[in-house]
């Protein structure tokens, strides 16, 4: 933890300058940091306690993930209203959309992304909503953000399966998605955690085949989320 009073004042100044923002970047002594404030993300306003629950859940789960795997950024400053971490690069979508990044580099980034999720699962943890925007990449290192989601199921196998399916689904949703990219993501994961989770994911989709067939039938309407699920179903279950 950073206990320097000058750092605390820099945090307060950044918040004062961006009063309405939940996530704030600022620079101190040449290093970029991110402040995450105890504010609503706008998605769960109906739940009165959700702001506090999300904030304290994130502190706890992020700290555990950092201790077990190093995949979560270290919390360097903490008070009752915010947490601060060091910046850890740009998210995966940023790298995949850059034209100056080679195909080989993009494949390697996705392999590392899959490895990161596999390492997390190997450590006995799951993420809950592994969106591509929550995976940061810098100099070969992947960092995971947004740990505010409480696990929905006690069954670890089910949680791992949902993590796996969600990550693939969100990649299928992107305009840049290609089968080589999907396979790179899977290669990274299975290289660390084996192929069991993929088998569970395939079995889960087959169990809900009606939804998969419905999504395929709706392809003609070009609805982004439905098309992404249809592609996922065709890839894993057909």
Predicted segments, located by residue:
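Nucleotide/phosphate-binding site architecture used for ATP/NTP-dependent chemistry
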Residues: 1-29, 59, 70, 196, ...
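Conserved structural core of kinase catalytic domains
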Residues: 39, 51-55, 73-110
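Conserved kinase catalytic-core helix
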Residues: 58-71, 96-133, 138, 142
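Conserved hydrophobic "DFG−1" position in protein kinase catalytic cores
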Residues: 25, 85-87, 137
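C-lobe/activation-segment region of protein kinase-like
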Residues: 147-238
């Amino acid at each position: 933890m950073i206990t320097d009073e000058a750092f605390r004042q820099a945090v307060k100044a950044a918040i004062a300058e961006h009063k309405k923002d939940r996530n704030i970047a600022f620079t101190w002594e040449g290093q970029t940091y991110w402040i995450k404030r105890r504010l609503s993300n706008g998605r769960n306003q109906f739940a009165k306690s959700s702001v506090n629950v999300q904030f304290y859940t994130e502190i706890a789960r992020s700290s555990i993930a950092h201790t077990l795997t190093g995949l979560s950024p270290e919390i360097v400053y903490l008070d009752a209203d915010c947490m601060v971490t060091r910046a850890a690069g740009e998210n995966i979508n940023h790298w995949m959309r850059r034209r100056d990044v080679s195909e080989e580099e993009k494949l390697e980034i996705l392999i590392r992304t899959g490895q990161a999720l596999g390492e997390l699962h190997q450590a006995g943890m799951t993420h809950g909503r592994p969106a591509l925007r929550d995976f940061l990449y810098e100099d070969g290192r992947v960092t995971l953000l947004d740990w505010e989601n409480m696990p929905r199921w006690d069954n670890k196998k089910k949680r791992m399966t949902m993590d796996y399916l969600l990550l693939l689904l969100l990649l299928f949703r992107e305009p840049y998605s290609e089968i080589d990219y999907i396979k790179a993501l899977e290669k990274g994961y299975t290289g660390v955690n084996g192929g069991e989770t993929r088998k569970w994911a395939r079995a889960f989709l087959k169990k809900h085949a009606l939804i998969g067939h419905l999504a395929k039938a709706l392809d003609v309407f070009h609805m982004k989320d439905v098309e992404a699920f249809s592609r996922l179903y065709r890839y894993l279950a057909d």
